[in-house]
Amino acid sequence: MDSKYNHYEIEKDKNQKWIDKKYFINHDLDKKPFSIILPPPNVTGQLHLGHALNGYLQDSVIRYKKLEGYDVLFLPAMDHAGIATQIKVEESLAKENLLKQDIGREKFLKFSYQWKDKYANIIKSQWNKLGLALDYSSERFTLDQDSKDTVNKVFIDLYNAGIIYQGVKGINWDPLQKTALSNVEVINKETPQKMYYIKYFLENSDEFVEIATVRTETLYSDRAIGINPNDLRAKNYVNKFVIHPLTKKRLPIITDDYIDQSFASGFMKISAHSLADIDILNKNNLEIVESIDESGFLTNICDEFEGMERFEAREKIAQKLQKENLISRVENYSSNIGYSDRTKVPIEILVKKQWFVKMDLFSKMVLDSLESKNKVNFYPSRFKKNLEGWMNKTYDWTISRQLWWGHQIPAWYKDEQTKVQLNSPGPDWTQDPDVLDTWFSSAIAPFSFFGWPNTYKKLKRYYPTSLLVTGHDIIFFWVSRMYFSGLYFMKDKPFNDVLLHGLIRDEQRRKMTKSLGNGIDPMVLIDQYGSDSLRWFLITNTTPGLDITYNEEKIKSSWNFMNKLWNIARFINLQENTKKVSMSKYDYWISDKFNKVESYVKKFMKKYEFTLIGKEIYKFIINDFSSWYLEFSKITKNIDFQKVIFKRLLLLLHPFIPFLTDHLFKIIYDQELLEHTFENKKLKTQKNNVDQLILVIRAIREFREKYQISKKEKIKYWIQDCQFLQEDIDAINFLTFSELSQNSENMTIVENIKIFMILPKNIEENLSKEKAQKIEFLKFEIKRAQSLLLNEKFISKAPTLKVEEEKAKLEKYQLQLKELLDEKIIE
């Protein structure tokens, strides 16, 4: 073995070896199955640190289950990521001065698949660098032909069941990408704005009602003024009209319970760009006319503002109203504004014909399942309540997207007819140009990735999957939708357990984003420290559901831990077998410690408590195995047993440190680690006194450290009522460079063991001088404080706080003097 740990040399070919040997591709059908689907990363770029954390957590579970004797399937997949990928491809085309409309749909899709192929290859190389135990023979892509077949079947089946429908509704609209969005694709952000208080004069009157709005660009779509029917003023205004400040049209004053009496004047303008407003307009049979188009520009109903960008128009319209004295006041105002999760621009509410999924049935199915015996287990459990809260208030899911990259909707149109089927009904029928929301295909991943409906072999064996590991930020995007899709189509939950991890934040606790420029490339870290070091840092610093703070110093510490393991392995490997040695008390002691850590790991793995696993493993290796057992082994030299326990330790460590453990297993034992499983039997133990021995050794070492006694000078000690055997005394002497003597005079007590030790004369003399000086100083300070406190002038004139300070000093000095005068033992 090399003298120094070299992560690059150790890791560079390991994953390819595992692939070549098909350790995670060949499946033993006689074993109990355990399956995980890797959450498909988007083919929009390279993996980030969050992907690394997610992959490491799953991979550690897969490797642990394999070593437990399961038939494991870790299925790799990638997501076509509709909006995100189309944005990237359009940006790439723009560099060549091309628009997607210039090249047409077919060529655009060809470019998109080329993009996908490029980044899929990059992602696969990164998976290999991470060391993920994936079954590449089962790899899937959410836009491969099998996925297309499944998506079409699911859409058609849900349409025929009346669950998917087409309707005209107010929907979330991304004006930059020009596509509909579902509610979970909209991020609400607190945004500073201006609140304009606009005068709407009553018809044929100098009286006006004051309307507060930040969105002057929507004024041209106003079709009524509303007031709450419980407002005492309502009876005086209902059935009256106001004159619109811009168009001069008559607008009726109507009532609706939605209107907040406490907001501003209590009057509200009813326009076409709010879901609540649209609902009120529909209830009152009022027309819906939009003032903002699909691109975020004002429409032809907006007079001189037609064609103006919406936010520019907001300012210009406000200026016009102010010029005409139609604004009574302007205030700074902050409120939540919806932004597109992908393009980061403020959304619009537009009335569009779109495809929707009815959510009432699916919500009930999930809620019922969560209360059943066959429910999904959430780690941490609090996220079950989060999901319940979401399912109780969910809206119908908008699933159509005005994109080209994705699953084209299997709906066909001719004149006023609509048919939903796979193939064209005949001549002159046109397919819907829209595609489905990316999450539609992701929602059916747990069964579509296993071949449904074309084949059932894998589905029967591996569905429901054993575990889903994902970020808590997509529980509504993805987890909820997989849940109801599985319940509806498979009549069973899609996974047994869900482990939700947090985000990785920078050292200032900020989310890592491109805009902040604080993202960390995991591949750079792997080059610098190794995949094992990065894995150990990430998984042992993650608690289910909580965010992680990135800390490069901890990654360096992880590398040092790997280096420690390397040095331990070198120590064991370099020793030569001599004669056979029987088990010593130290062997039994470390066996007991190992049995306990093995049990801890098993216990914590059941709840995915990786931080606790890391603490127990680290404590065993650093404190028990390295600091004590290997020291004791220099006395007993039971090399055979050292290799027995180290072999079991490497197996236990493998899920969390796969590259290094695999390498060491091959070097020391000339065997492949992944061709082994955990031992079922515990290591044999016997009652022993090694823990007491350690206490004595530590006490003598601390005595040497405290008084800075040279390591070349023997410490003389004596143990009162000594129960230790001569072999124990020999071990103490060897490991502390000391000798048993009855002339010791200073005593320390550890767990009722009285240990007497003598100080070398030169040190004792120095300590005596220091002690005398301290006593003299304390006596002087005590005398000074007493004199001051007996002085009546000081007591009467000095501030109370000063007097109390002197009393406290006197008490402290008296106590310190007593301790010094009584000092005859070493604590």
Swiss-Prot record:
One of its GO terms (biological process) is valyl-tRNA aminoacylation. ATP binds at K514. A motif ('KMSKS' region) lies at residues 511-515. Keywords: Aminoacyl-tRNA synthetase, ATP-binding, Coiled coil, Cytoplasm, Ligase, Nucleotide-binding, Protein biosynthesis. PROSITE patterns: AA_TRNA_LIGASE_I. It holds the Pfam family tRNA-synt_1. Residues 765-827 form a coiled coil. One of its GO terms (cellular component) is cytosol. It is found in: Cytoplasm. SUPFAM superfamilies: Anticodon-binding domain of a subclass of class I aminoacyl-tRNA synthetases (SSF47323), Nucleotidylyl transferase (SSF52374), tRNA-binding arm (SSF46589), ValRS/IleRS/LeuRS editing domain (SSF50677). The keyword Nucleotide-binding applies. It catalyses: tRNA(Val) + L-valine + ATP = L-valyl-tRNA(Val) + AMP + diphosphate. GO terms for molecular function: aminoacyl-tRNA deacylase activity; ATP binding; valine-tRNA ligase activity. It comes from the Bacteria. Its EC number is 6.1.1.9. Belongs to the class-I aminoacyl-tRNA synthetase family. ValS type 1 subfamily. Monomer. NCBIfam families: PRK05729.1, valS. ValRS has two distinct active sites: one for aminoacylation and one for editing. The misactivated threonine is translocated from the active site to the editing site. Catalyzes the attachment of valine to tRNA(Val). As ValRS can inadvertently accommodate and process structurally similar amino acids such as threonine, to avoid such errors, it has a 'posttransfer' editing activity that hydrolyzes mischarged Thr-tRNA(Val) in a tRNA-dependent manner. This is Valine--tRNA ligase. The lineage of its organism: Bacteria, Bacillati, Mycoplasmatota, Mycoplasmoidales, Metamycoplasmataceae.
